[in-house]
């Protein structure tokens, strides 16, 4: 297909999508034809004049209005022309209506295995939380109902698969809290322990991190297909390595530019590992040529980016109150481009609409192929990515993780009142 499939009015958003379509695989991709021109959105993201596989994808007609809205939100934008984020401190901002945007993905409800899997997963993770966390932090994490997110995001999984996803989610939250409070050196050391625990059968240094990861691998990853197991271990080891780098950036109070943050966030979000378990839960083990396919990559990246962009939006208030907002795309856009908070949030809402179109279009193209690995198996996977995207946002308004007792009010009004820094924040050992 040629780039002429893109309507001229959508060329701008295609360039934004381009940023989301690169770097999944560390292998170089064949160059694609160069699209015509740059736009206000291309300028915002400093996107070079080159194209990726998504340039081949036509955005579906129902999304024309949505993607044009993303462009119109920043029409007339000139870098530095808005209020500098460092000198402007609004107390309230409005979230984009992500539930409306993601309503194009079917609502498959909650997983019927939720209650039994939750009980067993919580008993398993509590072996490690009681070592790391104080009683108040344990109570807070229990109230966050992390396991409920898996019931939303994996509605099709059997008990075995759902328990695996809950165990992983509990690992990720515990590891995140642990590394958030430690130094960069401590995070790097923990990453080394994780890598050896996953890759060396006889390694055991006696730490809670080592025991936790070896137990998870034996319970779940050793039972997955060889491709899924290999990708999960590689992706998890890369995740903990980059989390160590995140801790070092936090110590230096360093904020990345937008392109580097995109690449960085794809790893620190750990969404790749969650998507590995999508294959596991669906009893799939896709061949590597599927994972290397450019159209598959564009759909995969769209789903992955939608998960962590949405997370950055809903978690911004919590993170800025803890002094961790530097590792959030809202701050990255504000700092890099000198725009105010609401402008950055509005842009991200439009960006999520464009990525939604990208995911659906990738699925449409792959479904038309004769190879059943695409037309049957990948379609199931892309549908499950939609469950993840929609379920992640639904859970974000049910948990107290991001908005505390105000979660239902925020869901209804979309208005978020900024917390004062460090007010109500819990220490890990508290």
From Swiss-Prot:
Motif DDXXD motif: positions: 176-180
EC number: 4.2.3.-, 4.2.3.88
Family statement drawn from the similarity comment of this UniProt entry: Belongs to the terpene synthase family.
Role this protein plays: Terpene cyclase that catalyzes the cyclization of farnesyl diphosphate (FPP) to viridiflorene and viridiflorol.
Binding site residues for Mg(2+) 2: 176
Enzyme class: lyase
GO biological process: isoprenoid biosynthetic process
Presence of the UniProt keyword Thylakoid in the record: no
Cited InterPro entries: Isoprenoid_synthase_dom_sf, Terpene_cyclase-like_2
Signal peptide (UniProt feature, chain positions): 1-25
MF GO annotations: metal ion binding; terpene synthase activity
Glycosylation sites: 113
The protein's name: Sesquiterpene synthase Agr5
Sequence positions that bind Mg(2+) 1: 176
Residues the entry annotates as binding (2E,6E)-farnesyl diphosphate: 401-402
Gene3D superfamilies assigned: Farnesyl Diphosphate Synthase (1.10.600.10)
Pfam families registered for this protein in UniProt: Terpene_syn_C_2 (PF19086)
Key words, A-Z: Glycoprotein, Lyase, Magnesium, Metal-binding, Signal
